[in-house]
Design a protein with these regions (language model features):
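A short, surface-exposed alpha-helical micro-motif characterized by mixed small hydrophobic
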Residues: 217-219
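Conserved signature/switch motifs of ABC ATPase nucleotide-binding domains
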Residues: 149-152, 169-170
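Conserved ABC ATPase "signature" region
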Residues: 68-71, 117, 121, 128-145
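ABC ATPase "signature
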Residues: 235-236, 244
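Helix-to-loop junction immediately C-terminal to a conserved catalytic motif
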Residues: 52
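The feature captures the beta-strand-to-loop junction immediately N-terminal to the Walker
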Residues: 37-39
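ABC ATPase NBD coupling module
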Residues: 13, 69-98, 122, 127, ...
């Protein structure tokens, strides 16, 4: 559905050049909910604007749906025949891509109905057809009773529902969501994510979701790309990224969405709960779906003579698969603890020594 190859974008500012995208390559499957996560300045918002060519990359190629391969060079876009794309062609491509933002960008002096109808005004549709389409969209986002209401009378979650309906007016194949839940409270965020999940299922809609919140990725996405300084530093299935993140920034994001992140605060405070003695190691254990429910902890304690003191533990479900986590103090002779850690790693329990009392 969406293919990006070696995409680059540099902004030339008075203060110097800023590389927003650095050799980005991504493949996003048809009908997928795909997440892109990163901190401010990572390049994720530039990436989403380049997907619909609101911002033209300096180089690379792009293919969205039936657009064919678009070659990007020196800030210009060229079609499969090597011809510079006209505004008409770019407009046709953009109509196949809807977009929602953190700030809803609604017309304050227009009703909900008029806001949703706005993209259809200049398409040549008959008035009756526009009305039918708008009410179809209102039903889709559960706002039919708000058709004649103005944005100022809506909650934040309702405003985002209007923005989603407007983005879907032209029946796009792709919906780009740029921090669409960042301005919402937790309940409204959950409701919008449920709506996006429902639209993905009902319409077969491909959704690219830009966020800085790993909890959002965990809740709705199937795959995720982690961006830092304009580059994709890690990419994969959401479950695999949570189970064994490789890049330092990915580990930080994963930790932020885990109940086990409390260990960091406990360590900062110097709590004795997480302070290993001379013969102990403080270890983070991640239990892959293949071993959740197995008796690995009791086996390690019994067979290797290792004392295990559980400090924190958690099991969550990601993409319908369980993922377990534990912070524990492992005590015993050095060789026994090392053998126990090796056994755990061989049995789909990934281990990370956080602190070592012998050092």
């Amino acid at each position: 559905m969406i293919q990006i190859e070696k995409m680059n974008k540099v902004f030339h500012l008075k203060s110097g050049d800023v590389t927003a995208l650095d050799n980005v390559t991504l493949n996003i499957g048809d009908g997928m909910i795909y997440g892109v996560i990163g901190y401010s300045g990572a390049g994720k918002s530039t990436l989403v604007r380049c997907l619909n060519l609101l911002e033209t990359p300096d180089s690379g190629t792009l293919s969205v749906g039936d657009s064919g391969v678009i070659t990007l060079k020196d800030g210009k876009a060229y079609d499969t025949q090597g011809r510079k794309m006209t505004e008409k062609k770019l407009g046709a491509m953009r109509r196949g891509i809807g977009m929602i933002f953190q700030h809803f960008n609604l017309l304050d002096r227009s009703t909900v109905f008029e806001n949703i109808a706005y993209p259809l005004r200049y398409t040549g549709m008959k008035k009756a057809d526009i009305e039918a389409r708008v009410f179809e969209l209102l039903d889709l986002v559960d706002l039919r009773d708000k058709a004649d209401v103005y944005p100022s009378q809506l909650s934040g979650g309702q405003k985002q529902r209007v923005a989603i309906a407007r983005a879907l007016a032209n029946k796009p194949q792709v919906l780009l969501s740029d921090e669409a839940t960042s301005a919402l409270d937790p309940d409204a965020t959950e409701a919008i994510l449920n709506l996006l999940r429902d639209l993905n299922r009902k319409l077969g809609l491909t959704i690219v979701l830009i966020t800085h919140e790993m909890a959002v990725i965990k809740s709705i996405c199937q795959r995720v790309a982690v961006m830092e300084n304009g580059r994709v530093v890690e990419e994969g299935d959401v479950y695999d990224i949570f189970a064994h993140p490789r890049a330092a920034i990915t580990r930080k994001f994963v930790s932020s969405a885990s109940a086990l992140s409390k260990v960091d605060k406990l360590m900062e405070e110097g709590s004795t709960l997480v302070r290993p003695t001379a013969n102990q190691k403080l270890v983070r254990l991640t239990f892959h779906k293949d071993c959740v429910g197995e008796h690995v902890i009791s086996t390690v304690s019994r067979d290797f003579g290792v004392d295990i003191n559980i400090v924190l533990a958690n099991v969550e479900v990601i993409e319908d698969n369980p993922l377990g986590g534990m912070i524990a103090l492992l005590g015993g002779e050095e060789k026994q603890v090392a053998a126990a850690l090796n056994y755990l790693n061989e049995n789909h329990v990934y281990t990370e020594v956080i602190a070592d009392g012998s050092i």
